[in-house]
Amino acid sequence: MSIEKGKGRAMDIDLPLGSESTLPWVEKYRPANLEDVVSHKDIISTLEKFISSNRVPHMLFYGPPGTGKTSTILACARKIYGPNYRNQLMELNASDDRGIDAVREQIKNFASTRQIFASTFKMIILDEADAMTLAAQNALRRVIEKYTKNVRFCIICNYINKISPAIQSRCTRFRFQPLPPKEIEKTVDHVIQSEHCNIDPDAKMAVLRLSKGDMRKALNILQACHAAYDHIDVSAIYNCVGHPHPSDIDYFLKSIMNDEFVIAFNTISSIKQQKGLALQDILTCIFEALDELEIKPNAKIFILDQLATIEHRMSFGCSEKIQLSAMIASIKTGVDLAAKVN
């Protein structure tokens, strides 16, 4: 994302005049050029060489959300096709049908034709392709093989293991890592200045912590808080996103380790309900806080194993009350076991 004045504007995507002020900041500050894309310098350099030598292959972009995969390929399309890049581009995402019928009809029809007076290939972007069925992926493989002269595919996914090996072998793969906090901070600073956000330095650092390398998440948090509060402090950030405050986690751990089971359960349940916290977020924060907890290594090992089991159960939709009880019990048991060893 751009950090220079005048760059990082909303891309010209046929929006009504004056609509830029209503755009989500994720779109408003999406990089228009490859030079504006944050981080991933090696990937950008390789893509620029492909484009300059007119040897663009089929590509597979994979990595966590909010790391610039879609922004990068759209910037590539602008560089290849110029301002009218939308005429040469087909983009399908999670809101579209990506079953076998979509591959046989939409994708095949687009890939099998060429633009009149156009000397270059067209491009198809399949975003969140890891949601495609195996049958659709097999059909896509045949389309990729048959129409390489007409079209280049860019397949984007979060989990590469959900993409069939046959498609992987036909694409040049690029892994997009989570963005470093310093890179996200540059863009966040630019947005804060451009949007005149009244935000405390500690609150900005909270945004960076909560984003965890996800630029989209950072900008969405910032925009939500800017809309809800005239002055953004740390509490505003955590209240707006419904994430446990670090002081809450410290309080939870002290209660678990010092109070009786029933008191600890009632204390955590009350705060959890009052602030609308999710047990999954509490579990993740307690996992992160265990590093600073002064308990024996064998107790940490036991607790971590139990937390992993609880998280696994939660993925199946188990009762949060039961799993909260299990979390409290596992931490208490781990601490007691360490005390007995001594």
Curated annotation (Swiss-Prot):
GO cellular component: chromatin; Ctf18 RFC-like complex; cytosol; DNA replication factor C complex; Elg1 RFC-like complex; nucleus; Rad17 RFC-like complex
Swiss-Prot/TrEMBL GO biological process terms: DNA repair; DNA strand elongation involved in mitotic DNA replication; DNA-templated DNA replication; mitotic DNA replication leading strand elongation; UV-damage excision repair
Assigned keywords, A-Z: ATP-binding, DNA damage, DNA replication, Nucleotide-binding, Nucleus
Amino-acid positions noted as binding ATP in the UniProt annotation, renumbered to this chain: G63, P64, P65, G66, T67, G68, K69, T70
Pfam families xref list: AAA, Rep_fac_C
GO molecular function: ATP binding; ATP hydrolysis activity; DNA binding; DNA clamp unloader activity
Quaternary structure and partners: Heteropentamer of subunits rfc1, rfc2, rfc3, rfc4 and rfc5 that forms a complex (RFC) with PCNA in the presence of ATP. Two other complexes exist where rfc1 can be replaced by either ctf18 or elg1 to form the ctf18-RFC or the elg1-RFC complexes respectively.
Function field: The elongation of primed DNA templates by DNA polymerase delta and epsilon requires the action of the accessory proteins PCNA and activator 1. Subunit 3 binds ATP. Also involved in replication and DNA damage checkpoint controls, probably functioning as a checkpoint sensor.
Protein family (similarity comment): Belongs to the activator 1 small subunits family.
Protein name: Replication factor C subunit 3
Gene coding for it: rfc3
